[in-house]
């Protein structure tokens, strides 16, 4: 179908992704049919306006004619011919033509205007609704993607897929559909008019169509990779802007404005360079298509003048032919120039479908425990983030009892956070297995598995919403009293009292209205409210001052009673009360025991503790 619509310019393979997206418009087929009828009305009135010239010149300025002989017609064609002659006489042949002709012209223009408005409105409406549905599905797909995908894919690329490419694919489709149908109908109608007026001259006009098709094919092939690179560059620019916005404090603190500007300028120059290529091709395409049309028009005028001098055609027919051909020029030009936006549309559709086809996070679990007891075991677990053979965890084995508080300590890169990320399956092991209450976590449904954990990470993320909604995010059915209790447990009563809005005060994008310690405590309150059987605290108290840390530590002590807790900490003073301390290095456990036991061994933990003690003392002295 696409080959016929584009006269062989694009093949079925080019439009595979686009045709897949067109499934989204099926619910609106009635509106599309109505738009097609309106487009047909535009084409019909446009064609008749060209044919309007011949009777205007041949009959409009002559004396009223005698009524046509409407004898009994034999057959459909004769009947239609009688109707046409009767209509022509009613408009052009009577003495009333001084007002019937202008009125008829106004009616034609009004009908064309109504049809044009209807087709434009309906197609735009379908376009907006289709974009909305595709973006909804893309967002739903994004929610199913793995943590690894989000870590490896720049945010600018995701934004480009969901915003730019969706808009380019569907909005261009609406415009192109209108152009292809309306202008093809107009060209077809005008061609019929030309054939009716003078079939010999019409052959010359028809000959320019293959030339225009070859011209469009040339520019399509030339710009395919340029348009694709341009779309990728826009994604890179989105990423640069997002990173600079999110990291504005780092940019300002390290005087990185020049570096940020250089990054942006480099991407911007690439987009400008590619845009120039597209513009040059578009600008060059129009003059060449105009030249072909002008040559055809010149040949037509030459032959028509010769025919007129030899009595083969009337002045009215000649003028109508020229007007029809001139009216044909604009739609032909639109059809000839459609290859570039069509190429953009198809490539954008490829990007959208590629995103929709991204494999979701694997969830082969079938078990759905309501609430686990909290016994955890790691068996021969390996984790490799890269393909160079370096393991984040190497033959890791650990058993954690129900209600036990286990602290993971070690240098950066020793694998502490990897252990925490394995439990909710943010990271998948390369080998080995992990069990909770004797059940392999791979056999538990992801939503049920993650319902067993409350996580507070050192990388706090808060939503641009109120304090109340951010805390309630972990339990949407919680009431104000429960949220207030969680905030109080996280030592945030003073924050509530400081604002007349209390719980419902806005906290800004990612908690921009809060201090670093307050942001951390809001995340802790969110974890407290969830009341999960297993707590994962990844540097949860790293941003708190000493007094706040003491109060929050007390709240966490009460919260972790009869619950399993895994604590990751660099500040070893915060893990002294843990039931067991796991000392890690190079993805392996090298020591474990209570604080007193490890200090008595005078090993690796003691060295880390001494270093941590010196750092703490230095901070307190400062």
Curated annotation (Swiss-Prot):
What GO cellular-component annotations does this UniProt entry give?
plasma membrane
Q: How does it sit in the membrane?
A: Multi-pass membrane protein
Class in the EC hierarchy, top level: translocase
Name the catalysed reactions: ATP + H2O + lipid A-core oligosaccharideSide 1 = ADP + phosphate + lipid A-core oligosaccharideSide 2
Residues spanning the membrane? 32-52, 91-111, 192-212, 286-306, 312-332
Q: Name one Pfam family in it.
A: ABC_membrane
Residues reported to bind ATP:
410-417
Record-linked SUPFAM superfamilies: ABC transporter transmembrane region, P-loop containing nucleoside triphosphate hydrolases
Q: Domain named ABC transporter: which ranges?
A: 378-611
Q: What is its main location?
A: membrane
The enzyme's E.C. designation: 7.5.2.6
Say if the entry is tagged with keyword Ribonucleoprotein. Answer: no
Key word Methyltransferase present? no
Q: Which stretches make up the ABC transmembrane type-1 domain?
A: 33-344
Q: Which UniProt keywords apply?
A: ATP-binding, Cell inner membrane, Cell membrane, Lipid transport, Membrane, Nucleotide-binding, Translocase, Transmembrane, Transmembrane helix, Transport
Q: Which GO terms describe its molecular function?
A: ABC-type oligopeptide transporter activity; ATP binding; ATP hydrolysis activity; ATPase-coupled lipid transmembrane transporter activity
Where is the protein localized?
Cell inner membrane
Q: How does it assemble?
A: Homodimer.
> What does this gene product do?
Involved in lipopolysaccharide (LPS) biosynthesis. Translocates lipid A-core from the inner to the outer leaflet of the inner membrane. Transmembrane domains (TMD) form a pore in the inner membrane and the ATP-binding domain (NBD) is responsible for energy generation.
Please state which protein family the record places this protein in: Belongs to the ABC transporter superfamily. Lipid exporter (TC 3.A.1.106) family.
Domain comment from the record reads as follows: In MsbA the ATP-binding domain (NBD) and the transmembrane domain (TMD) are fused.
Protein name, entry field: ATP-dependent lipid A-core flippase
């Amino acid at each position: 179908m696409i080959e016929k619509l584009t006269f062989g310019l694009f093949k079925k393979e080019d439009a595979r992704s686009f045709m897949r997206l067109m499934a989204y418009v099926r619910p609106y087929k009635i509106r599309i049919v109505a738009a097609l009828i309106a487009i047909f009305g535009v084409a019909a009135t446009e064609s008749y306006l060209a044919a309007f010239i011949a009777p205007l010149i041949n009959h409009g300025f002559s004396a009223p004619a005698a009524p046509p002989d409407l004898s009994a017609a034999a057959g459909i064609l004769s009947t239609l011919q009688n109707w046409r002659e009767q209509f022509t006489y009613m408009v052009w042949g009577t003495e009333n033509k001084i007002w019937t002709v202008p009125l008829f012209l106004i009616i034609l223009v009004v009908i064309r205007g109504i049809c044009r408005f209807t087709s434009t409105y309906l197609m735009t409406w379908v376009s907006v609704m289709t974009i909305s549905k595709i973006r909804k599905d893309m967002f739903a797909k994004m929610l199913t993607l793995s943590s690894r995908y989000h870590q490896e894919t720049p945010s600018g690329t995701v934004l480009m897929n969901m915003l730019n490419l969706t808009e380019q694919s569907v909005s261009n489709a609406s415009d192109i559909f209108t152009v292809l149908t309306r202008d093809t109908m107009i060209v077809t109608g005008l061609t019929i008019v030309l054939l009716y007026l003078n079939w010999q001259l019409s052959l010359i006009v028809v000959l320019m169509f293959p030339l225009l098709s070859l011209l469009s094919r040339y520019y399509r092939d030339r710009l395919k990779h340029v348009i694709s690179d341009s779309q990728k560059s826009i994604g890179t620019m989105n990423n640069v802007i997002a990173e600079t916005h999110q990291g504005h404090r780092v940019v300002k603190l390290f005087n990185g404005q020049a570096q940020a500007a250089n990054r942006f300028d480099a991407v911007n120059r690439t987009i400008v360079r590619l845009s120039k290529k597209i513009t040059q091709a578009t600008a060059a395409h129009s003059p060449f298509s105009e030249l072909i049309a002008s040559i055809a028009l010149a040949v037509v005028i030459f032959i028509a003048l010769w025919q007129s001098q030899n009595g083969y055609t009337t002045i009215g027919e000649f003028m109508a032919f020229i007007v029809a051909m001139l009216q044909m020029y604009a739609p032909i030009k639109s059809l000839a120039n459609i290859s570039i936006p069509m190429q953009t549309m198809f490539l954008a559709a490829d990007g959208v479908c590629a995103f929709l086809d991204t494999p979701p996070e694997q969830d082969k679990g079938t078990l759905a425990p309501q609430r686990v007891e909290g016994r955890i075991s790691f068996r021969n677990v390996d984790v490799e983030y890269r393909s160079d053979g370096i393991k984040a965890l190497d033959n890791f084995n650990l058993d954690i009892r129900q209600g036990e508080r286990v602290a993971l300590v070690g240098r950066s890169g020793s694998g502490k956070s990897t252990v925490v990320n394995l439990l909710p399956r943010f990271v998948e092991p390369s080998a080995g297995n992990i069990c909770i209450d004797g059940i392999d976590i791979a056999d538990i449904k992801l939503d049920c598995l993650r319902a067993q954990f409350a996580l507070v990470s050192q990388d706090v993320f808060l939503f641009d919403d109120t304090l109340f909604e951010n805390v309630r995010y972990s339990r949407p059915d919680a009431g104000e009293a429960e949220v207030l209790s969680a905030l109080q447990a996280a030592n945030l009563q003073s924050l509530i009292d400081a604002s007349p809005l209390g719980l419902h005060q806005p906290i800004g994008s990612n908690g921009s209205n809060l201090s670093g310690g307050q942001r951390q405590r809001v995340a802790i309150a969110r974890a407290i409210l969830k009341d999960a059987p297993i707590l994962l605290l990844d540097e949860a108290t790293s941003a708190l001052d000493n007094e706040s840390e003491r109060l929050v530590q007390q709240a966490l002590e009460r919260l972790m009673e009869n619950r399993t807790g895994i604590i990751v900490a660099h500040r070893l003073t915060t893990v002294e009360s843990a039931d067991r301390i796991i000392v890690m290095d190079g993805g392996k456990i090298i020591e474990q025991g209570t604080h007193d036991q490890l200090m008595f061994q005078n090993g690796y933990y003691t060295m880390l503790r001494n270093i941590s003690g010196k750092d703490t003392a230095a901070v307190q002295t400062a």
